[in-house]
């Protein structure tokens, strides 16, 4: 069964010119990029995207980071796309939880600057795709 998921290549990855590397890893896994858009994220979209973290102490710095520079947003499709992207990205903490061979394990050092976001469930993917790509 084909699934869709949202991938965000965050400002730290864009600044470090890692877009091609990350997209390449997704495509080499056998997934398809169905939509791709480089955009500057406003506070409203960022707040909606990270609404589940609103009561957490890091919410303000999370919004500040995701709005600090351009983000490459992508709809990724393929069999088990949500789980496949989560496997590719690795754990949220790039040093302690992300395995070598994952995007974060290979390319990131800090939890806040962990390069990439992937939806954590099919329900989250549907909600996030509707936010980031409302016309699709």
From Swiss-Prot:
Its cofactor is Mg(2+). One of its GO terms (cellular component) is cytoplasm. ATP binds at residues 10, 58, 86, 92, 104, 114. Gene3D superfamilies: Nucleoside diphosphate kinase-like domain. Keywords: ATP-binding, Cytoplasm, Kinase, Magnesium, Metal-binding, Nucleotide metabolism, Nucleotide-binding, Phosphoprotein, Transferase. SUPFAM superfamilies: Nucleoside diphosphate kinase, NDK (SSF54919). One of its GO terms (molecular function) is metal ion binding. It is found in: Cytoplasm. It catalyses: a 2'-deoxyribonucleoside 5'-diphosphate + ATP = a 2'-deoxyribonucleoside 5'-triphosphate + ADP; a ribonucleoside 5'-diphosphate + ATP = a ribonucleoside 5'-triphosphate + ADP. Its main location: cytoplasm. Major role in the synthesis of nucleoside triphosphates other than ATP. The ATP gamma phosphate is transferred to the NDP beta phosphate via a ping-pong mechanism, using a phosphorylated active-site intermediate. Belongs to the NDK family. Homotetramer. This is Nucleoside diphosphate kinase. It comes from Mycobacterium leprae (strain TN). The lineage of its organism: Bacteria, Bacillati, Actinomycetota, Actinomycetes, Mycobacteriales.
């Amino acid at each position: 069964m084909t699934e869709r998921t949202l991938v965000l290549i965050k400002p730290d990855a864009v600044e470090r010119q890692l877009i091609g590397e990350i997209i390449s890893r997704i495509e080499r896994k056998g997934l398809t990029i169905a939509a791709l858009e480089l955009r500057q994220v406003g506070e409203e979209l960022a707040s909606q995207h990270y609404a589940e973290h609103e009561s957490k102490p890091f919410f303000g710095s999370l919004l500040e980071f995701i709005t600090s520079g351009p983000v490459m947003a992508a709809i990724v499709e393929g069999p088990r796309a949500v789980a496949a992207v989560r496997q590719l990205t690795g754990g949220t903490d790039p040093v302690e939880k992300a395995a070598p061979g994952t995007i974060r394990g290979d390319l990131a050092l800090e939890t806040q600057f962990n390069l990439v976001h992937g939806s954590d469930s099919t329900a989250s993917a549907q909600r996030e795709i509707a936010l980031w790509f409302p016309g699709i």
